[in-house]
Amino acid sequence: MMTPTELITHYRIVQHSFAPLRLSWWETNRVIAVQIWRDSSFFTRILIAFIGLCLLSIFSRLTRPRSLRRLGIPGAVQPRFSTWSLDFKKVLEDSAKKYPNSPFCLNAFGTEYAVLPSKCYDEVKRLPEHQASAFAFFREAFHGAWTGAGVQTPELGRTIAVELTRGIPSLVHWRQMDCAEAFKMCIGEPSEWREIQLFEAIQRIVISVNSSSFVGRELGTNQNWLRLIYNMPLQLGIPTVILGWTPFLLQPLLKPFLFAPLRMTQRKIKSMLRPVLENDVQEYEASSDKKNLLSPKEQGKVQLTGWLLSRYKGKLDFEVLLQDFITVLFESTPSTASTLFHVVCELAADPALQDMLRQELEEHTDNGSLPQTHLNELRKMDSVMRESARASPFSYLVLYRKLSIPTKLSMGPELPAGTNICVDAHHINTSPDLWDQPHTFDGLRHYRARQQPQNENRYKFANLGSDAPSWGDGLQACPGRMFADNTIKIILTHLLLNYDVKLRPGESKPEKGAMPNGSIVPDVWAKVLFRSRASSAVNEGKK
């Protein structure tokens, strides 16, 4: 058995022996380490491993970013029980009550945030991107170098905000047909009440409808394609959670393994996308009338490839184009599906609300066909959507930003560069100063507000403002909110005109959970009952 003194002596002897070979420092120490390990006893090996882990832990602690608490920012009020059963809403409410005029620290999955009170919403939204960047935050929090999260070119953002928004109305009828195909795949046409696992069905419908618009109906109805897009959020989220509990120094060693499934999925998506985009590029380059080619069409998919090519102006890398499409397909799914899930839950719990929206649809559709507009005519449906987003938002926190320069806000100390900040949205959505009975779902709340002449263009689902925090705000607000608005209305229209939906007997609306970073988690296992209105009517007629 070798003692520590003998180890040091052995190291010096071997080092002296290898001196004539002129090995590098790394090569010499690698050979010595292998030799010492081979000659050591079991006890000595355990001791070496223990010392190594201790040194690694100390180094990791010394090199990790310093906590914001050193600036005097207090920590969030934490419950006594495990964070695995964390009631984040209570954490936020208790912390806001204790620190009404101060930011507080929150650490979730290895990322530390300074959570600012809701009264700071307008101040934070005005911070320019070069000072406080949303994309920089998401790149860091979701390991963008490995996952592609938070990677969006300015050209893509402008294309979504301008050309896509302009092209939505002309495709309404075609998207209704895309939606019908999606429902046929995911729900079927049950003549009797059928249990449907709601979140999975909604997610697949959203993926299919959006994919048909971006890459064509052939891929949008391809089961393998749907599975790949469906898996991406899980393959991003689960490794992110694991890395949050991993020592900082070990994370680079684990990332290649943890994100391997996501990277494999992205490679498969790219291989399926490549022929579609190559066709688009050839069509764009061969066209002599690009203005006509890129104008809104009433059939097929949107001209996303052509719009991007016109903005990149010949400097496009095909891999960048592929990544742009993956970004669009990924970012257009989770928040839209979550919002739609909660709206359907409200409808399932209230048959009278379903009938009211069906009556509105009868007034604004022609044999089931919606007008080729942005669908602002559907005011009651819009109100239900906005109220659902208020009562069941995508996250309790909004305006996530990473500071690139030291920043002094109206409250709290100066925050150093590299600080992650966000704003408490929960106390906007539940503010009694903004909303009457804020803890009650009122589907027509915003419809009634818009009856006032001065509110004609306010209180819409896709509007920005300090009373509608879900989209973010300012120049870094979600550029695809009009597309999401259109998608949800088309899907709800098909559902209401073709299906009845209700909760299972004796059940109430599915409960919501929350992650330690404030994200609201729908009950992904919840089941509701669907029945085809046409099939059930036929059966009733036969009786």
From Swiss-Prot:
It comes from the Eukaryota. It is found in: Membrane. Keywords: Glycoprotein, Heme, Iron, Membrane, Metal-binding, Monooxygenase, Oxidoreductase, Transmembrane, Transmembrane helix. Pathway: Secondary metabolite biosynthesis. One of its GO terms (molecular function) is oxidoreductase activity, acting on paired donors, with incorporation or reduction of molecular oxygen. Pfam families: p450. Its main location: membrane. Cytochrome P450 monooxygenase; part of the gene cluster that mediates the biosynthesis of a tyrosine-derived cytochalasan acting as a fungal signal recognized by resistant rice plants and leads to avirulence in Pi33 resistant rice cultivars. The first step in the pathway is catalyzed by the hybrid PKS-NRPS ACE1, assisted by the enoyl reductase RAP1, that are responsible for fusion of the tyrosine precursor and the polyketide backbone. Belongs to the cytochrome P450 family. This is Cytochrome P450 monooxygenase CYP1. The lineage of its organism: Eukaryota, Fungi, Dikarya, Ascomycota, Pezizomycotina.
